[in-house]
Design a protein with these regions (language model features):
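A short acidic, often aromatic-flanked loop/helix-cap motif at beta-alpha or helix-coil junctions
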Residues: 35-41, 97-104, 174
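RecA-like P-loop NTPase motor core
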Residues: 1-58
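Structural beta-sheet core signal
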Residues: 59-61, 94
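Activity-critical C-terminal alpha-helical subdomain
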Residues: 66-161
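Short acidic, S/G/P-rich loop/turn micro-motifs used as interaction or catalytic elements
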Residues: 6-8, 64-68
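Hydrophobic, Leu/Ile/Phe/Ala-enriched alpha-helical segments that form helix-helix packing faces
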Residues: 17-22, 79-84, 112, 196-200
Length: 201
């Protein structure tokens, strides 16, 4: 996965999905610390060793957006070219749905229980509009608008939870297995689940 390590929301999100929908599957996550490291020597060696021993290797990464100088089409082309260059092949899934621009946080946001926490999302989005609309004399924004990961982190930190549960946030565990905050049955997760169903051994 694209995450830096297992103390990330991406890792815990995927782990919750696999535990819930693929309970019999044994999965080992390798964190590549950014898509730019996918084809480095260490990761290529791990991929080769895993494939030689008969293990299935799949890659999950953000498609990202044009604003980040990427996007689905460009990310896909880069991965395809790099697979040819390095003579390696593996199935891969680009968040959010293997066809559109976006990232894993796009999927997480779609699974957030907006229906149960409407007030939080309405207030936060009003805040985003207010902050992004504040400009200096030159018309440039004065403030940075929080990114989607920050919004989702704030969503969970705003919940009234016992300390024992709140302590899990520090390791990226945003309680994805808790239906009071996340709905892992939303339609937007179907492409990812179908991909996992096809490739997890």
């Amino acid at each position: 996965i694209e995450a830096k390590d297992k103390k990330t929301s991406e890792y815990h999100f995927l782990e919750a999905i696999i535990r819930l929908f693929f309970p019999g599957k044994e999965v080992d996550f390798i964190c590549m610390n950014g898509i730019g490291n996918l084809f480095n020597e260490t990761n290529l060696n791990q991929i080769s060793l895993a494939q030689e021993s008969g293990e299935q290797v799949i890659v999950l990464a953000d498609a990202d957006t044009i604003a980040k100088r990427q996007g689905y089409a460009q990310r896909k082309a880069e991965i395809e070219n790099d697979m040819v260059t390095h003579a390696v092949s593996f199935p891969y899934f680009l968040y959010p749905n293997n066809q559109d621009d976006g990232d894993v946080e796009t999927l997480m946001e779609s699974a957030a229980r907006r229906d149960l926490h409407t007030v939080f999302f309405d207030c936060f989005e009003d805040y985003e509009k207010c902050v992004s609309g504040t400009k200096d004399e030159s018309g440039n924004p004065i403030y940075n608008v929080p990114d989607l990961k920050s919004k989702l982190n704030t969503y969970m930190r705003a919940q009234k939870l016992p300390r024992k549960l709140r302590d899990r946030f520090g390791s990226g565990d945003w309680l994805f297995d808790n239906a009071d905050y996340w709905n892992l049955n939303v339609a937007t997760l179907l492409p990812l689940k179908e991909f996992l169903a096809m490739w997890l051994k």
